[in-house]
Design a protein with these regions (language model features):
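Functional-site microenvironments in short loops/helix caps that host divalent-cation chemistry
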Residues: 26-40, 63, 69, 74, ...
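Short, structured beta-strand segments at or near domain termini in extracellular proteins/domains
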Residues: 331-347
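C-terminal motif of bacterial Sec signal peptides marking the signal peptidase cleavage site
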Residues: 9-10
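Short, P/G- and charge-enriched loop/turn segments at secondary-structure junctions
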Residues: 48-50, 80-84, 321-326
């Protein structure tokens, strides 16, 4: 019986792949480098293709790998059944540093109406992909949302504000379009194909929101919603009937307030964010503890995280989880994208 060979890597050591001859010269070929096809003198040689280097796409930051205790940071008896704690590990990925803005999403719908109308149909694009601008009036009874309904998505005044009125399915379509746009460019310039853009899993979102701080109740790390000067640290509803105390009665610009330690803006408040996972009250026992995600195509409810401009502080907590039906569009739900980081992690090679 042949014993398996296990290659392990310790901190600060050279890559174990270096032992397999990657990047080295062929001693049998007179010192010449191994060909790109990995075959030399009738033998297959361990080598890597040159020219590949994954860097953070524009507007994204690298979220390192790590381990976190998912769930409520504080004891919450009422939520114990749906927010149980579990230790999980997350591999590195890239994440948008802000929520997807009106300006960014407008480029998507403009592209759809120009390039894809013959395939998808104008009715589908307008009913499914175009933001429901009437959500500002429909979400609240006896509320005058005419100004936001008429101008929020179309006016330059709101270009850098997070897009809302987007269903989970529309967010997924945006990710697919963004992936094609990026890889078409890379293909034209003979570059390697990039991993796809997608929605974050709940575990990825929670890990990123905490900014590397173990057990952080809020993205800024401490358990308070205001700083020492009494200024609120996010866009939410701090008092009964007072939406203006933080400076913004509705949404705020996507880069408002200070970022967390990973460089992410508005991971608490402003707009709640769609996640990839389906919602289940007690899904943690059935998911793995490495890169967990709960996919159930028969479950129409999808996880939203982060709380919004209309929510009280409880919904801003990193461990708080709630849901919305995938086809619903709200004035307080947006999204941001992530992308897998492939291969070794900078600083650990």
């Amino acid at each position: 019986m042949i014993a398996p060979i296990v290659i392990m890597q310790s901190c600060g050591s050279k890559s174990p792949l270096s032992k397999l001859g990657i990047g080295k010269k062929n001693s049998k070929g007179g010192g010449k480098e191994i060909g790109m096809d990995g075959v030399r003198d009738g033998e297959i040689i361990a080598t890597s293709r040159k020219g590949y280097k994954q860097t953070a796409p524009y507007g994204m930051v690298l979220i390192p790998s790590g381990s976190l205790m998912m769930g409520q940071a504080d004891e919450d008896v009422m939520s114990a059944r749906i927010s149980m704690n579990k230790r999980v590990t997350i591999v590195p990925f890239y994440m948008d540093d802000t929520e997807v803005t009106n300006h960014e999403y407008r480029q998507f719908v403009n592209s759809m109406t120009t390039d894809s109308v013959s395939v998808l149909g104008e009715e589908f694009i307008m009913s499914t992909l175009y933001p429901d601008t009437a959500v500002w009036s429909k979400d609240f009874t006896y509320h005058n949302g005419d100004q936001m309904t008429e101008y929020y998505f179309s006016s330059p005044a709101f270009d850098m504000y997070p897009v809302v009125g987007i269903s989970w399915d529309a967010a997924v379509y945006f990710c697919k379009w963004r992936t094609k746009l990026f890889n078409d460019f890379r293909s034209q310039h003979t570059m390697f194909k990039s991993p796809r853009y997608r929605l974050p899993s709940e575990a990825e979102w929670e890990w990123a929101a905490r900014g590397g701080k173990e057990g952080a109740k809020y993205p800024w790390g401490n358990p308070y919603v205001a700083n020492g000067k009494g200024c609120f640290l996010a866009n939410f509803k701090p008092y009964r009937g007072n939406y203006r105390a933080d400076g913004y009665p509705y949404t705020a610009p996507s880069n408002a307030f200070n970022p967390n330690d990973y460089g992410l803006y508005n991971m608490a408040g402003n707009v709640a964010e769609w996640c990839q996972d389906a919602y289940a009250e007690s899904y943690m026992p059935v998911t793995w503890d490495l890169n967990p995600v709960y996919n159930d195509e028969n479950e129409p409810r999808k996880i939203i995280k982060g709380g919004s401009w209309k929510d009280v502080a409880y919904f801003l907590e990193t461990g708080t989880r709630t849901y919305e039906f995938r086809n619903e569009r709200r004035s307080y739900i947006g999204f941001r994208c992530v992308m897998d980081r492939l291969g070794s992690v900078p600083g650990r090679e």
